[in-house]
Amino acid sequence: ADCAILAPRNKDVEALNQAVLERLAGESVVLPSADEVVGGVGEHRPNPEFLHSQHPSGMAAHELVLKVGAVVMLTHNLCQPRGLCNGSRLVVRSIGTYRLVCQLVGVDGQPGRVVALSRIRMYSSKTDYAFEWTRTQFPVRLAFAMTINKSQGQSMERVAVYLPRPCFAHGQLYVAFSRVRHPSGLRFVLMPNDAGHF
C-alpha cells in the first residue's frame, strides 16, 4: 500500500481505480448512501434517483464499491491527532453496513494503526441546488490511483505516473516526481497520441 498510480485528471484516476478493484481478489461489497432532503421544498421535491445520481464536490458517491484489501483515501478531516485527515490513505480490513475497519498506510515499512470508520452526514452546497440535502456515507474513496494534486505532501516507496495526455498545469510533473522516496521507485506509463507521438 506504500505505492500509488498518479494521473493528472480525475477521469483517469476513476478508471484506474475501477480497473484495479476489479483485479483485486475477493467479493465486491456495494454500500449505498442514505440521501434525504432537509426541510420542505414545496411541490418541487426531487426524487430519490435524482439525489443518488448527484456527486458534488466534497460529498461521497451514492454507491461505494469496496473489497477487503482495497486502498482508500479519506475525503474529510475526522480526527487529526489520530492521523484521520482528508487525504490519509488506508487499507480496508473488514466491511460492514455501518462500520469499515481500516489500517492506516504505514510509513517506512511500519504498519499503521487500525481504525474503525463510521458513516458521516455530508451536506450539499446551498449554491448548487435550490434545496438542501444530505448524504450519509463512509467518507472514503478508492485510492489505488489518485490525482497528482491530491498526492501533494505524501511520500511513497513506489509511484507509477500515468500520462494518457500531457499534464495541464505548470509544476504537475515535478509534484509527481517528488512523491517517490528514491528514483528507482518511479515508473511512467505514457500513451501515444493519435499521430503516434508521446
Over which residues does each language-model region extend?
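RecA-like helicase/translocase P-loop NTPase motor core
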Residues: A1-F198
